[in-house]
Amino acid sequence: RWWAWSTNSNWKHPYGEASSINGLNNHPVVQVSWYDAVAFSEWAGTSLPTEAQWEYAAKKGEVTNSRAMNIWQGVFPVNNAGSDGFEKTNPVDAYKPNKIGLYDMAGNVWEWVADWYRPNTYLMGGRDNNPIGPLSSYDPMEPTIPKRVIRGGSFLCNAQYCTGYRPTARMKTSPDTSIEHTGFRCVMSQEQMGKYVNQINN
């Protein structure tokens, strides 16, 4: 089974109320909504990356070998061979980092970014070096439901189903969604980093 309904799932119980995060300290947190990710980022003095920032980091250190990332291995969806030892998430050091030292920018879990989703975001951005993304969401498939962007693909991605592990691939989901293959990473601006260093030194 690759989709299954579970009750009382949350970040402490990612696969249902009988599950736990024991032994998963070095795995990405999952079952977090976009709102959860933003709340944690703000608490930590960081932020979610913009879509442009995320893609820049992914492209700078692009991983082109699909065996160097945690994606579905086998015939999707009937057989997940798990030949790398992971049927779901992997610890962050299970695969080598990309060329700029970032782990799991492809595969493992989808990652929330700050931006609203629109299918024509890049056309709207023109030639901006660091576009901030659209001011509102529009998904022509579900125009009444606001969506945020997720990037990077997950352990459910496979060339037969989802090629979201490509650095340019985009997906979207409603910001109140939490699911077992979506997490997030935080970024720091130079200003945020300066505040962090001052806190450590004082």
Sequence positions of predicted segments:
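Short, structured beta-strand segments at or near domain termini in extracellular proteins/domains
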Residues: 180-195
